[in-house]
Amino acid sequence: MKDDIEIFNVFGDGFDRFAFPGKQYRVTAGCGGEAILIIGSEKTAIIDCGMAYCGGDVVKNIKDKLAEEGRNTLDLAFLTHSHYDHMGALPYIRRAFPEVIIYGSTHCQEILQRPNAKVLMKKLGTAARDLYRPDSKEEIPVDDLAVDIALKDGDMVSLGNETIQAIEAKGHTDCSMAYALEPDGILFTSESTGIVEAGLAINTPILKSFADAMTSLKKCKEYGAKYICLPHFGLIPQDFNEEYWMRFQQGCEDRVKMVQEMKKEGLDADQMLERYRDRYWDPIMEQEQPIEAFLINAKNIIKAALRALDEK
């Protein structure tokens, strides 16, 4: 399991971002998206599974924790969206647990049926492997990337005494989903409602639509979660919940304003990307995201901001 690094210690040494209220456990391995295992009264589930290069380690972490809980199978997997850093390890999950059922949005299901999407995932997954595990030459698998059951907004899936509710949360992508776990009141958000970074900065990776992100923000706020678990981070303090939502909205407005200013200056796409990188990229971030992926996202964030300006 990856070690905590400076960029994650934003709430001080006394706060444990993985101290969940019930039988929820971090089984993350390596860099990239988090993987959270949920032990229900009847079924087990995982929220995302991380990158492919560390897929074998994720499986080991899952098996070890299942054994501690007296279980031996993973029943369900829920995907927040179709990006390689959140579900690249899925082929390893399927091989280790052949009966696992994969859930995601309808659009996520459709994307994973596209050959060009898998080509990109393989490319980015290989770049991540070369960066984080340079001695490895293990092939990055993509053939088993698929959603078995498509969920729509409001759908419920039972784990026994517990339920997981799907909440459509577009903005980051059109395939993004958040998931609410009851009765513990945990909201596992998507990147459509942001990520905490160093210095309590809120990253707003809105690749598709800032308007959709605001809709997702409204829905997630209205859910009224006791606990908020952010992608690429973990839990935030309960007394920070409302401030987090406020900071996320402000962060979105700040990014759109920055792009508006660049547009007024007459900057072209390359110049905008360079300025965006200068403002938001820090080399320490490469411990979690390769620069190639950052730049791909940055281009799309700028395009989404330009669309938001056109819609005003």
Where in this protein do the model-derived segments appear?
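C-terminal regulatory/interaction regions
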Residues: 258-312
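A short catalytic or substrate-binding loop motif that flags glycine-/basic-rich loops and adjacent residues
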Residues: 28-31, 151, 170-173
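Conserved beta-strand hairpin/beta-sheet module of binuclear metal-dependent hydrolase folds
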Residues: 8-67, 178-191
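Short, electropositive alpha-helical surface patch
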Residues: 239-256
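Active-site HxH/HxHxD metal-binding segment of metal-dependent hydrolases
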Residues: 53-56, 64-152
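Metallo-beta-lactamase
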Residues: 49-53, 163-170, 174-242
